[in-house]
């Protein structure tokens, strides 16, 4: 196992109607003016924005609003937010939404607190942020875990590059308000895509090619089992509060570093491969991960079939054969069967993408930073490897 540091400064306020406390929570932050950042019109039409405004008015907190964040959040919206916040002298950022809104808020926070640096440089990782304006969250989509994480992902429309910032505790939200009822109105596809994203944040940390800690493995496996079980419930009962609550809390725990303790950080190849899909073709992140995972797993499992066999036995109750390869492959198939059971794609075709070999080559070229980097630690992947995985996923 590897040495590690575990730090979770985010205050979690969990449960029914907790978003109604937002005025009091922000007052405790001693902020003068808040940006309320949100995504689609649903935050307005549902009455959520009215409730937030009312709570802030009651607390005597000034605010401005900026909506229009889309999935795979855009750099142009980040720049718009930075300009607005400078003009309005905002000193706190409130994200009302899911991972895209939270990540957009974090990027705005970086841009405001580092005025002499182009914010995109933090995503190219050519510069490191020295500060970040504080961020708080009212979560409406359980998926990304960005409400407790120290990273964010932004898409630059120039070249359609989707890039993540380096992990940095500066951008971890000060607080996250988690009311499972706010996720009731999500479309089924978005709910289940979010469940895949939650699973993958733990899976990326689970599949490492080193000796891991038994306690971390047990936490990770329990979290994965919980997500699989409750995501199936939500296929039939979209307003099941208990299932929604389990999924929402799992989303936060899956990406706050807990399931990576002692693992050295994780593999993250599948995420890197999906970032090119999401940036280029604007697909839902979780669905893109589901479409790629089986091909990635079959390509790399032979680097440590025993680890994949452990996954198969402990997550899907597959009998352990003396042939670890056989058990490993059975586990990969079981995972794909699970994706199908929640109507998630297991190929690029099912994702709605029928890509040519040239288009796949271009994805691998971008993912490898023009053939200058490898990805993954379970098995290091160069550009040719990436291309083979994309091709196998067709």
Positions of the model-derived regions?
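ATP/NTP phosphate-donor binding region
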Residues: 1-92, 348
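Short glycine/serine/threonine-rich phosphate/pyrophosphate-binding segments
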Residues: 19-22, 45-48, 75-78, 100-105, ...
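Short Gly/Thr/Asp-enriched flexible loops that form oxyanion-binding sites at enzyme active sites
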Residues: 51-52, 82, 101-115, 148-149
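Glycine/serine-rich anion-binding loops at beta->alpha junctions
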Residues: 90-106, 140-146, 280-283
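A glycine/threonine-rich phosphate-anchoring loop and its flanking beta-alpha core
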Residues: 114-212, 310
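C-terminal charged capping/lid subdomain of soluble metabolic enzymes
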Residues: 170, 308, 315, 319-394
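Active-site segments that bind and position negatively charged phosphate/pyrophosphate groups
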Residues: 205, 209-334
